[in-house]
């Protein structure tokens, strides 16, 4: 949901900038006499009522977008514990069983763990 909203914001901003660049470019067109005409520059200025109607007719208004963003950021926050638990489950799936009581120390019997120096080959290999 947030990525879609972010994409919509970026798209709206980029289209607004590109439209602004086109408008600036059209205002800078040179009159064949060699200079800018004041009458021509007035043609590119739109009346405020028309601009207001264009702004209101857009699919996503800036106010609506800001309201949606504020609602998304104010929404109930989930604790990070479920995500941590999911990641733990993922790594446990890769590595082995989960320890049900993480606070109790696990006694490791050193006799059951072979070290690298005590590895013996079976008699059939010799």
UniProtKB/Swiss-Prot annotation:
Q: Which GO terms describe its biological process?
A: neuropeptide signaling pathway; positive regulation of blood pressure; tachykinin receptor signaling pathway
> Methionine amide-modified residues are where?
95
Family listed: Belongs to the tachykinin family.
Sorted UniProt keywords: Amidation, Cleavage on pair of basic residues, Neuropeptide, Secreted, Signal
- Leader sequence range is 1-20
What GO cellular-component annotations does this UniProt entry give? extracellular region
Q: What does this protein do?
A: Tachykinins are active peptides which excite neurons, evoke behavioral responses, are potent vasodilators and secretagogues, and contract (directly or indirectly) many smooth muscles. Is a critical central regulator of gonadal function.
Q: Which organism is it from?
A: Bos taurus
Q: Which InterPro entries match?
A: Neurokinin-B/TAC3, Tachy_Neuro_lke_CS
Q: Show the segment(s) annotated as Disordered.
A: 102-126
Protein name as annotated: Tachykinin-3
Report the locations given in the UniProt record: Secreted
**Propeptide residues, chain positions:** 21-83, 99-126
């Amino acid at each position: 949901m947030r990525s879609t909203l972010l994409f919509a914001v970026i798209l709206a901003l980029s289209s607004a900038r590109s439209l602004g660049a086109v408008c600036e470019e059209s205002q800078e067109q040179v009159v064949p006499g060699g200079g800018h005409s004041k009458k021509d520059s007035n043609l590119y200025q739109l009346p405020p009522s028309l601009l207001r109607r264009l702004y209101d007719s857009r699919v996503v208004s800036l106010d609506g977008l800001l309201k949606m963003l504020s609602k998304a950021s104010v929404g109930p926050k989930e604790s990070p514990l479920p995500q941590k638990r999911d990641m733990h489950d993922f790594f446990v799936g890769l590595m082995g069983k989960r320890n049900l009581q993480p606070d109790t120390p696990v006694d490791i019997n050193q006799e059951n763990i072979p070290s690298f120096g005590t590895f013996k080959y079976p008699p059939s290999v010799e």
